[in-house]
Amino acid sequence: HADALAELDWQALSADELALVPPVVVLERSRRIFGGGLGSLSGLLRTGRPIHVIVIDDDTGLGPVESSGARAATHPDLGYLAIAHRDALVLQSSLAEPAHLYAGLGRLTQSLRPSLAVVASPAWHRPVDPWIQLAAAHYGRATPCFLYDPEAGSTWTACFELTPNPQIDEDWPQLTVRAAGEEGEPVEQTEVFTWAHAALVTPEARQGVRVLPPSAWSDEQVPIADYLNMDQEPRSRCIPYVWVVANDGELQRAILTREMA
């Protein structure tokens, strides 16, 4: 049997035989990947070998930046980069969505393809509650959950799953804001929840926000959802704002820098 065993490699095993082999799982942090390991990860995803990489990402990209271009440069989306390899299974999930994460990791470990799981984790050192960080990033589309499985079908829609993201048929999810009116009466208002709303949870990002008294409101100030849907020319004459609830429960208008929007 020596000659036969010498020629045997893992590609000669059947699917049932491969299922008996313990999966190879690599655990890494996003900082190390972006710090010089991106090329190695790309090479691994092209090998065709059933090696599974789990990356813990505690950078939601919601921190302060000087321009939108700087934001993109400091926080590339690892999950989207991995999808470009086409033949790899890619999971992007969050500790805030444990059911999605559990199911996705199960698919990952059973796959005979190279795979990557990007798991959003809170920045534990920040003063904001970790789960508020994660929920805000998820609702603000900063860390959307998805699963790309090339074996799920022959079309993009069959291979790409976007559950359990909130209100996936809308640009932004809508939430009900509860606050106090001018006379202290309870009021409710439906608002979209955008990337900028999520960034407000991060103390470092609040330097791009200013709360205005009603006397400073003007027609040039527009809700951020309307601002984002404007063409470039009219947008340049407007200032985006969001509604925030003050410590006393009062609803206040907060304008944003254009980079923040």
What are these regions (language model features)?
Residues H1-H52, G61, A72-H85:
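Cofactor-binding active-site loop characterized by glycine-rich and histidine/acidic residues
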Residues A123-A261:
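Flexible, low-complexity linker and terminal segments
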Residues I51, V55-F160:
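Core active-site phosphate/anionic-ligand binding loop and the adjoining beta-turn-alpha structural block
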